[in-house]
């Protein structure tokens, strides 16, 4: 199945010249020598909800436009990986791949994130109930279990 990673789409948009100009205006400390320091930007927006909203309001419409473009050029079942769905569940069948907070924290630690950054990031997100309300929930214990759950969902819904 084709998979679209919206974090990658977002990063591509953030690295554009239009985004650089926007970031220089709104988040000047996150721009160094015409390059975006993503750690600095993340630190800014995950510590200030208003600044996160400013970034999302700039970025999300562009991400949605790019997503629609990619989908229009594709056929069949497409998986879209989304970390911040912002109403996408209204347009698509939504599988929520859910892991408990302690599991998410452990995974982020293994990726080298500091505990304060992890806490700030998690605290800026919607709570578990909101995520669970978005669609069909698959509990993410490990990859083998996840693949099995996805296969079951696809078979039940005749999407294979």
Residue ranges and their predicted role:
Residues 1-5:
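A conserved segment at the C-terminal end of the G1
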Residues 8-75:
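ATP-dependent small-molecule kinase phosphotransfer cores
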Residues 14, 45, 56, 89, ...:
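Short, flexible helix/strand-to-coil boundary loops that buttress conserved ligand/catalytic motifs
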Residues 20-24, 101-109, 119:
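An amphipathic alpha-helix signature
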Residues 67, 110-160:
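Small-molecule kinase domains that catalyze NTP-dependent phosphoryl transfer to phosphate-bearing small molecules
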Residues 68, 72, 77-111:
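ATP-dependent NMP and nucleoside kinases share a basic, alpha-helical "lid"
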